[in-house]
Amino acid sequence: MSDSLHTHKPEADHDHDHDHSHKLQPVQKHEHGGHGDSCCSAKVAAPSLIKLSETTTAGARLSNFRIDAMDCPTEQTLIENKLGKLVGVQQLEFNLINRVLGVTHDLPSTAPIIDAIKSLGMQAEPLEQGAELPAPAPEKKPWWPLALSGVGALVAEVIHFTNAAPNWVVAVIALISILSGGLGTYKKGWIALKNLNLNINALMSIAVTGAILIGQWPEAAMVMFLFTVAELIEAKSLDRARNAIGGLMQMTPEQATVQQADGSWVLQPVKAIELGARVRVRPGERIGLDGEVVSGSSTIDQAPITGESLPVEKTIGDKVFAGTINQSGSLEYSVTAAANNSTLARIIHAVEQAQGARAPTQRFVDSFSKIYTPAVFILALAVAVIPPLFMGAVWFDWIYRALVLLVVACPCALVISTPVTIVSGLAAAARKGILVKGGVYLEGGYKLDYLALDKTGTITHGKPVQTDYLSLDPTADASAPAIAAALAGRSDHPVSLAIATAAVDKQFAPLIVDNFEALAGRGVRGEINGQVYHLGNHRLVEELNLCSPALEEKLFALEKQGKSVVLLLDKSGPLALFAVADTVKESSREAIQQLYELGIKTLMLTGDNVHTAQAIAAQVGIDEAKGDLLPTDKLQAIDALYARGHNVGMVGDGINDAPALARAEIGFAMAAAGTDTAIETADVALMDDDLRKIPTFIRLSRQTSSILKQNIALALVIKAIFLGVTFAGIATMWMAVFADMGVSLLVVFNGLRLLRK
């Protein structure tokens, strides 16, 4: 009957913001146009929060800016480097999904920030604090410049190959092709070079310019055209990954039917509906806002929130969620959350935040990129200069080889594949009702080989009922049930609720409880009419030195039946005994079997007695069960598994079992829908109470890890091959672009496969 709160791991345990001290903020609908930027940057996996100074000054304030051109780590790196040099800027927070930049600064105005961003070729629009974010305007580019570029590049190649016209004609056609398709790349490349940033735009601009200078006009045109096409396809693919989560938000209707003061019903925009308003929903309609049913009954498809395949019965007092579908009957509900603070909105916001946290593979890519790109650039310079100067080689041949090296100098495939794969995995999990709070958990789930589980509400339904009552003191026979009910009514533990509920029909006179105190892992204590009473488990009785062999025998008999026993005591001894039983969820048996098939061992940790723990564990097939545990005992059990070399996950309700959940590699919270605490604090929040979602998560984690490894291997092999054939003088520039961008698209599409899981 503990009432502990779920506090979480320190930030040092994982490379992301693990304190979760912030509250989830409202979310707005958003959509992305095909912003044609390549995401090649050494800092693609950087966290969204960048601290430029150790502490913020007393006068620091937060200014938010919408930057429509900022939807890729390429722009993030440029902005970070530029604003990092601006005196007074202390912290940057990038939201690439919504294209919003938060700047913590102590500048007198935001003009220097806006000017600095403008110098990078981007426009920063200041946003009012708390204002709703406007959706990014889809960027509509005319198709004819790209078509002209492609036709020009092809014609230049054909004329050059057949000698059908003079070289100056080829040069003119190629120049038209380059200018029509590559001006944007040149502009971005120049800005990057001015800021000493070797991103893909800078490298491609240098390579194309070099090809022009040595007279390779047709190849320069073809390289620029292929790069522009690949970049466009890549941007569309990235948008698909970004919009996978945002698409959920479109499930909420724009309007809902609201009861007016005169009793009439009027359609109103959901954003304008106030808390407490009475909303009507007919069969087949989507529910527009979170609320509580006040009239009617129906079945509701909750798949957008919980991933449940079967509709759920709803009646008066039940919660309903925005975005879910009313199926059979009419309902009226009272609004409990604003449109931008619904459970669905908070889920989407949490996943968007999770996209900024670095997974282990992203950290590897980050480190690799910082070394690889400058190294290949220096190698290209050496290749262009050393053989002609010191080995008598032909300048043209080796400059050309150096230009080919520049094309493969940016690890685009590596850089792009990791975030696309992680975002796709996060979206796939969210659609199944599994809220993963970062790539570090999505990728780390495949390592788990041991899962510790709480009992009540996790393996069992968490809705126990009182099955037995036994008076232990004839003098208190009349008063004991009422006293127990009064104490139990002050606790929110399921066992206490069962005792309190059983007393409702008996209509006891209400008793006032003074000096009430919850005793973690043992029970509760309170004063009634000046007398101190305890209501608790076997451990509490022993602590009070009020146990006896006769009482032990009674407890043992009930515990062997899988029942939890609670005793009412005063200073003289036990007054009454209450036995409570919970039922095992059928889904728990299936989940444990699936975990067994995945090679994951299971351990049940519960504050309930050992006999009940073993009985429940035997029913569902759990490998090992430990009972009579305090929260600190559960922590020690997790530590013991770590000491044996296991990677451990812990499943609880997101509120109790705080130390164990915090210590585990991944903390899973059950039934998080409608529970703010669980959504905010869990590493992985299951939106309903179906334990089968954990093996589903582990399978998804293994698939994600496999795809990440496939992508890294493919990208590195292609890079190695092209470095080899470049030195052999076989590779051409357009072949390098085709291969480099081709493998980038392959790994992106491979990552997007997770959206179909």
Question: What kind of feature is each model-predicted range?
Answer:
Residues 143-154, 363-392, 401, 405-411, ...:
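Bilayer-spanning, highly hydrophobic alpha-helical transmembrane segments
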Residues 201-205, 254, 305, 364, ...:
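Conserved catalytic phosphorylation-site environment of P-type ATPases
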Residues 530, 562-564, 570-710:
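Conserved ATP-binding TGD loop and adjacent catalytic N/P-domain core of P-type ATPases
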Residues 87-105, 110, 247-341, 439-484, ...:
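Conserved cytosolic catalytic loops of P-type ATPases
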Residues 1-168, 244, 262-267, 274, ...:
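Flexible metal-binding regulatory segments at protein termini and peripheral loops
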Residues 158-166, 186-189, 194, 206, ...:
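Membrane-embedded alpha-helical bundles of multi-pass transporters
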Residues 115-137, 143, 174-259, 274-282, ...:
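Actuator/coupling domain of P-type ATPases
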Residues 159-160, 324, 449-492, 522-603, ...:
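ATP-driven catalytic headpiece of P-type ATPases
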